[in-house]
């Protein structure tokens, strides 16, 4: 697994609580909601223009500017300036995942002419929140800074009533990982990759493929969401959902559904145009 922890920050809970109270009253964007199964949303703290309405991520070469919301969060700004090279920051966002929501397994940067170094600083989480990369599952702990290899297939999910909050920072892509996180403590010896998922069996697979009996345009999105979440609970590769979906649609025999399944895999894993949105 190329994703790894870079260090730990001792969070000031009082000051963090003050900033989170401001965020709780703020408007979160639904941009990129086509990547979500359930409620996944974000708000920009820093971006290319400093304008709150700039929501899409593009490759640029100038230090990110604070948005009005970002300027109103003194502690989060301090975390950004103290633990990252501010001249290398291109975007900073708060990403919130709510109960029983996940990101559909995907690869980032497919629509960009370049890529960033993406890091997560965990602000609030619990044991029912997980990240995945390919066939691995892991838990990012509170106060930890992680490098996420977003070019590989990955996902994230929250299966708790309490939302998960991460400060996600995109760093200029030519920096070395050793330069990304600064003024941090060494991580603890805890094992972040303990895998308690169930074994995958032929019987389970046939149960999943049984969706071919009922799949239709009316329930297609709901079935995609179920398939996207299975790898959080069973020992399978996160992209296996696309093979299952294509086989379900093939067994159903409806050309429109087969085309939708192929388009879904293409968009999330293979190729997508700048500004392209997936509707399904």
Swiss-Prot record:
<dbReference type="InterPro" id="IPR007803">
    <property type="entry name" value="Asp/Arg/Pro-Hydrxlase"/>
</dbReference>
<keyword id="KW-0560">Oxidoreductase</keyword>
<dbReference type="Pfam" id="PF05373">
    <property type="entry name" value="Pro_3_hydrox_C"/>
</dbReference>
<feature type="binding site">
    <location>
        <position position="108"/>
    </location>
    <ligand>
        <name>Fe cation</name>
    </ligand>
</feature>
<feature type="binding site">
    <location>
        <position position="164"/>
    </location>
    <ligand>
        <name>2-oxoglutarate</name>
    </ligand>
</feature>
<dbReference type="Pfam" id="PF05118">
    <property type="entry name" value="Asp_Arg_Hydrox"/>
</dbReference>
<keyword id="KW-0479">Metal-binding</keyword>
<dbReference type="InterPro" id="IPR008035">
    <property type="entry name" value="Pro_3_hydrox_C"/>
</dbReference>
<comment type="similarity">
    <text>Belongs to the L-proline cis-4-/cis-3-hydroxylase family.</text>
</comment>
<keyword id="KW-0408">Iron</keyword>
<comment type="function">
    <text>Dioxygenase that catalyzes the 2-oxoglutarate-dependent selective hydroxylation of free L-proline to cis-4-hydroxy-L-proline (cis-4-Hyp).</text>
</comment>
<keyword id="KW-0223">Dioxygenase</keyword>
<dbReference type="GO" id="GO:0046872">
    <property type="term" value="F:metal ion binding"/>
</dbReference>
<dbReference type="InterPro" id="IPR037037">
    <property type="entry name" value="Pro_3_hydrox_C_sf"/>
</dbReference>
<feature type="binding site">
    <location>
        <position position="106"/>
    </location>
    <ligand>
        <name>Fe cation</name>
    </ligand>
</feature>
<protein>
    <recommendedName>
        <fullName>L-proline cis-4-hydroxylase</fullName>
        <ecNumber>1.14.11.56</ecNumber>
    </recommendedName>
</protein>
<dbReference type="GO" id="GO:0016706">
    <property type="term" value="F:2-oxoglutarate-dependent dioxygenase activity"/>
</dbReference>
<feature type="binding site">
    <location>
        <position position="154"/>
    </location>
    <ligand>
        <name>Fe cation</name>
    </ligand>
</feature>
<dbReference type="InterPro" id="IPR027443">
    <property type="entry name" value="IPNS-like_sf"/>
</dbReference>
């Amino acid at each position: 697994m190329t994703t790894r922890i870079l260090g730990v920050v001792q969070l000031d809970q009082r000051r963090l609580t003050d900033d989170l109270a401001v965020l709780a009253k703020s408007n979160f964007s639904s941009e990129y909601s086509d990547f979500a199964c359930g409620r996944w949303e974000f708000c920009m703290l820093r971006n290319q223009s400093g304008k709150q309405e700039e929501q899409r991520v593009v490759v640029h070469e100038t230090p990110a500017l604070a948005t009005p919301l970002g300027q109103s969060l003194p502690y989060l700004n301090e975390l950004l300036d103290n633990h990252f090279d501010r001249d290398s920051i291109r975007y900073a966002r708060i990403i919130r995942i709510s109960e029983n929501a996940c990101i559909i397994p995907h690869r980032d940067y497919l629509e960009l002419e370049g890529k960033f170094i993406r890091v997560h600083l965990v602000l609030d989480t619990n044991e029912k929140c997980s990240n995945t990369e390919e066939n691995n599952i892991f838990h990012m702990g509170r106060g930890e800074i992680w490098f996420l290899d977003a070019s590989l297939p990955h996902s994230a999910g929250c299966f708790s009533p309490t939302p998960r909050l991460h400060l996600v920072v995109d760093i200029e892509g030519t920096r070395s990982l050793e330069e990304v996180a600064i003024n941090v403590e060494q991580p603890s010896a805890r094992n972040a990759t303990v895998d308690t998922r169930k074994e995958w069996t032929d019987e389970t697979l046939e149960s999943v493929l049984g969706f071919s009996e009922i799949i239709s345009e009316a329930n297609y999105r709901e079935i995609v969401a179920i398939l996207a979440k299975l790898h959080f609970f069973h020992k399978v590769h996160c992209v296996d959902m696309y093979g299952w979906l294509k086989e379900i649609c093939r067994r159903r025999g409806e050309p429109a559904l087969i085309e939708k399944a192929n388009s879904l895999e293409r968009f999330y894993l293979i190729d997508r145009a700048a500004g392209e949105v997936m509707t399904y």
